[in-house]
Each structure stands twice: as structure tokens, then as C-alpha cells.
């Protein structure tokens, strides 16, 4: 009788601990998603800030490009891997930080762009150095920014991109909807808004990513798009449980595109006995966040209770 009572008592205590842990961790998973959502909102704000800076530069009265600058641009203009532009294989044009790729073989077509794009460099640099203020929103890292000009058919990457590894040859990718956004949707639906793309395979990295797209307008007409790629490493930094590093070992985190079915597996538990806590949340744009914790986390974090049982 005494042995049975002890078993009942210790089992009741263990069940109580398990239920309490379930409630606490369910609330914590909701907190993780809320923090990630805040990080996405901040990324949207930064993208909009960059796009606004570019639009102001486009709207300002442009002085004519000097003969010296035009000569420097055309001397640095090069062709490689069936594409053309500036800083394709090495940093030959110091006026731009990154790489400009274009479908045109004529350097005169990108002279004005090369004179304008330092405004994009300044905007990205300024936004990257904004303080986090201890919010832990994953803002300290440097995500991949670029500007796509739909009218003049060029793309400018803030980070240098070696054309031997990636060349923008598919200039109709937006119209084909390969990133989940069609040009007609941009023109009709999200004037001035930042849109989250579907999850798609990035041509540059061959990995599943999603992008934030902010339109750039001139005189009310769509001219280009400022893009920010969010990849698996970015998402790991956003979702990482800094205050509970042990939990990360037993946490499953996946983003799934509800339309295409593509996913980004952000983290997987080291062991998978069975899930004892899970949480699913749908973000705007058809992106589903799925989180779950393996039972081994409870056993590891509550080992004294398990040992007592």
C-alpha cells in the first residue's frame, strides 16, 4: 500500500510538472513567433526606408553626368558570363560598392543608373547601422539587399556578386511569377506597400528563400523594386532562443508556403522521440510557422523531477 501510494504521489507530481511545462512552453512558443513577426515588420520598415530614399533621389533634379564620370563608368564597363555591367568579377568601379548587372551591351544605358545608385548604397548602409536597443530582433546581421530596375532592365546588388557564380539572365522572372509576385499584382495591388513573396528557390544560392519587395515609383509609374532576401541563416538568427539555448537543441522550426508547399526548415531537434508541445501560426502572405518541442527537452530540463519519480 505504501509503495503504491508513493508511486501515485510521485506520478501525480510528475504529471503536474508536465502540464505546467506544457502551458509555459506553449506561451513561450507564441512569444518566439511574436518576436519573429516584429523582426519581419522591422525588415519591412527598413526596406521601405531604402525605397523612399531611392525615390527621393530619382525625383530630385539630376545634374548631367560629367564627361569624366561617364568615361570612368564606360572604362569600367565589362562583359562576362553572357551578362554586362560594373564590378562583375572585381571591384573596378569605385563609385559603386556592389555589382551592377544589365542585359544591355551599351555602357551609355547605365551611366545615369551608375550615377544614381550611390543613393541606394547610402540608404542600405544607413539602415544597417540602426541600433537594436536590446530588442533581440535579429537586426544586427547583414541581409542581402538589391534593387531591380524594371524599366532599364538592370539589377544592382549592394554586396559584390561575382558574375562567374551568378548572372541575371532571366529578366522575365517577375512576370512569370517565380517568386510568387506578378508585375500586374504589383501595379494594381500594393502601390507603396511592401509585400512578402512566396517561398522560392533563389537562382543565386539555389536555396529556398523568401523576399520582401518594396516598389519604387517615379511620377506615379512603377520603375523598380527594392528587394531583401531572407534565407535560412537569417531565419535561424530571428528564431534562435537566446534566453534558452538548451531549448534550441530540441526545437523544430519550419516555415511553409501554404500555396506552393515549399518550406524552409530552420531548425530540427537533435532527437525526435515525440512532440509534447507544438504551435502553428499563419503569417500574412500565406506563410505558416510551425514550432514543436521534443519530449527530451522536458526530461533534460526537469531531470530532478524525473529522477525523483
Where do the model's predicted regions map?
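Hydrophobic segments of polytopic membrane proteins
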Residues: 183-186, 192-199, 234-241, 253, ...
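Juxtamembrane membrane-water interface segments immediately C-terminal to a transmembrane helix
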Residues: 15-45, 51-55
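Extracytoplasmic/periplasmic sensory segments of membrane signal-transduction proteins
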Residues: 30, 44-172
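Extracytoplasmic/periplasmic ligand-binding sensor regions of membrane-associated signaling proteins
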Residues: 128-132, 136-226
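Extracellular/periplasmic juxtamembrane segments that couple receptor/chemosensory ectodomains to their
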Residues: 215-218, 230-233, 243-309
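Extreme N-terminal signal-anchor transmembrane helix of membrane signaling/transducer proteins, especially
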Residues: 1-23, 307-309
Amino acid at each position: 500500500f505504501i509503495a503504491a501510494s508513493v508511486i501515485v504521489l510521485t506520478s501525480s507530481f510528475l504529471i503536474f510538472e508536465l502540464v505546467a511545462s506544457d502551458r509555459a512552453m506553449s506561451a513561450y512558443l507564441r512569444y518566439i513567433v511574436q518576436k519573429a513577426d516584429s523582426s519581419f515588420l522591422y525588415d519591412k520598415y527598413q526596406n521601405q526606408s531604402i525605397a523612399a530614399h531611392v525615390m527621393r533621389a530619382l525625383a530630385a533634379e539630376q545634374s548631367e553626368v560629367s564627361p569624366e564620370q561617364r568615361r570612368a563608368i564606360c572604362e569600367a564597363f565589362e562583359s562576362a558570363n553572357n551578362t554586362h555591367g560594373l564590378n562583375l568579377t572585381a571591384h573596378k568601379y569605385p563609385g559603386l560598392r556592389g555589382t551592377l548587372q544589365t542585359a544591355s551591351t551599351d555602357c551609355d544605358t547605365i551611366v545615369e543608373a551608375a550615377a544614381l545608385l550611390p543613393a541606394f548604397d547610402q540608404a542600405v548602409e544607413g539602415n544597417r547601422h540602426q541600433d537594436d536597443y536590446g530588442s533581440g530582433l535579429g537586426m544586427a546581421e547583414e541581409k542581402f539587399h538589391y534593387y531591380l530596375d524594371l524599366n532599364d532592365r538592370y539589377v544592382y546588388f549592394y554586396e559584390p556578386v561575382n558574375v562567374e557564380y551568378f548572372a541575371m539572365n532571366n529578366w522575365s522572372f517577375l512576370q512569370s511569377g517565380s517568386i510568387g509576385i506578378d508585375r500586374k499584382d504589383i501595379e494594381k495591388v500594393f502601390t507603396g506597400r511592401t509585400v512578402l513573396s512566396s517561398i522560392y528557390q533563389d537562382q543565386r544560392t539555389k536555396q529556398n528563400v523568401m523576399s520582401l519587395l518594396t516598389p519604387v515609383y517615379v511620377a506615379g509609374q512603377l520603375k523598380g523594386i527594392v528587394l531583401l532576401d531572407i534565407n535560412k541563416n537569417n531565419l535561424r538568427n530571428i528564431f534562435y532562443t537566446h534566453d534558452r539555448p538548451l531549448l534550441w537543441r530540441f526545437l523544430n522550426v519550419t516555415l511553409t508556403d501554404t500555396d506552393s508547399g515549399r518550406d524552409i526548415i530552420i531548425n530540427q531537434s537533435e532527437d525526435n522521440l515525440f512532440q509534447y508541445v507544438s504551435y502553428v501560426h499563419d503569417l500574412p502572405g500565406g506563410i505558416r510557422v510551425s514550432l514543436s518541442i521534443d519530449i527530451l527537452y522536458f526530461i533534460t530540463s526537469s531531470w530532478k523531477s524525473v529522477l525523483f519519480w
